[in-house]
């Protein structure tokens, strides 16, 4: 797996991409996507940014069209890679978050829902790109959100959500403090110990290579 250094989202976006070391089943690729969403949310939080939209692009492996049952397994669009090999057309979609956020919970849930909506579970995944669109400073978003809440929100529900987001922000601050002091692998999610996870390996790399 390697970082996609040539990937350049639009100026108001923050994103990352991975090329997996081998073809991943959709369930394992979803795990990697959740790790990426978690890292993206922390990156946004550290930069003082929020986003209101996620964009996902998933590239399939050529092995998805190999084998005797390939024709019965896939009937969608096909494209050709740079080596002239036939591959399923990449999956692509976006998910609106409702309000600007850098919440790990909200971003991970939205990314997972987006993956489930656009990715064909019968195909093998090789590349994953996740982007946070329409990013802007947290303070700027808070001013706009406050005006909207005054007019449209249920007060009790809004207060409960704000309390939960405040707890999340304190947790994100604590995670970043620990990682800055002891390294990114000093504190990781339980999902990153599952088979197929890549975050711990990526945390030990600099510029796409092992540190």
Give names to the regions the model predicted.
Residues 1-211:
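Basic, low-complexity intrinsically disordered segments
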């Amino acid at each position: 797996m390697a970082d996609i250094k040539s990937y350049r989202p639009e100026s108001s976006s923050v994103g990352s991409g991975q090329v997996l070391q081998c073809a991943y089943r959709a369930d394992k690729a979803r795990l990697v996507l959740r790790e990426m969403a978690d890292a993206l949310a922390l990156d946004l939080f550290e930069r003082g940014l929020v986003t209101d939209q996620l964009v996902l692009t998933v590239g399939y492996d050529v092995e998805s069209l190999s084998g005797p049952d390939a024709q019965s397994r896939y009937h969608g669009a096909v494209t050709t890679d740079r080596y002239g090999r036939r591959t399923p057309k990449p999956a692509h979609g976006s998910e609106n978050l409702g309000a600007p956020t850098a919440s790990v919970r909200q971003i991970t849930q939205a990314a997972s829902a987006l993956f489930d909506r656009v990715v064909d579970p019968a195909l093998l995944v090789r590349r994953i790109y996740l982007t946070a669109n329409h990013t802007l400073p947290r303070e700027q978003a808070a001013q706009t959100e406050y005006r909207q809440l005054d007019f449209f929100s249920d007060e009790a529900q809004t207060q409960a959500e704000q309390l939960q987001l405040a707890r999340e922000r304190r947790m994100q601050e604590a995670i970043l403090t620990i990682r800055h002091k002891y390294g990114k692998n000093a504190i990781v999610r339980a999902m990153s110990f599952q088979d197929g996870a890549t975050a711990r390996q990526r945390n030990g790399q600099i510029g796409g290579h092992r540190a």
